[in-house]
Amino acid sequence: MSRSIKKGPFVDAHLIKKVDAAVAGKDKKPIKTWSRRSTVLPEFIGLTIAVHNGRQHVPVYINENMVGHKLGEFALTRTFKGHAADKKSKR
């Protein structure tokens, strides 16, 4: 179920402050955040945001296709190495 239109998108206040400062200062450094729940807004386009995945900060370059999605969607938390091979079938 999606969020109500009348409420608007959710973005953490500290992230908005950092984005505004980066846009005003033309800063190209990645913005480090732990807020995976924040929605990508059109003001974020062209910025690199380092989203925490539980272990490290994954740099995510924001483009226009990402607007409306959550930041956590672009920083995967689980790594799949593949299932163990069956040793009997290899013979």
UniProtKB/Swiss-Prot annotation:
Pfam families the UniProt entry points to: Ribosomal_S19 (PF00203)
InterPro entries: Ribosomal_uS19, Ribosomal_uS19_bac-type, Ribosomal_uS19_CS, Ribosomal_uS19_SF
Cellular component terms per the entry's GO annotation: cytoplasm; small ribosomal subunit
Keyword RNA-binding: yes
PROSITE patterns: RIBOSOMAL_S19 (PS00323)
UniProt-listed GO biological process terms: ribosomal small subunit assembly; translation
GO molecular function ontology, one term from the record: rRNA binding
Keyword vocabulary terms for this entry: Ribonucleoprotein, Ribosomal protein, RNA-binding, rRNA-binding
UniProt KW Ribosomal protein keyword: yes
Highest taxon above the source species: Bacteria
SUPFAM superfamilies, A to Z: Ribosomal protein S19
Job description of the protein: Protein S19 forms a complex with S13 that binds strongly to the 16S ribosomal RNA.
PANTHER family per record: RIBOSOMAL PROTEIN S19P FAMILY MEMBER, SMALL RIBOSOMAL SUBUNIT PROTEIN US19M
Family of this protein: Belongs to the universal ribosomal protein uS19 family.
Name the record gives this protein: Small ribosomal subunit protein uS19
Species this protein is from: Bordetella parapertussis (strain 12822 / ATCC BAA-587 / NCTC 13253)
Lineage, uppermost ranks: Bacteria, Pseudomonadati, Pseudomonadota, Betaproteobacteria, Burkholderiales
Gene: rpsS
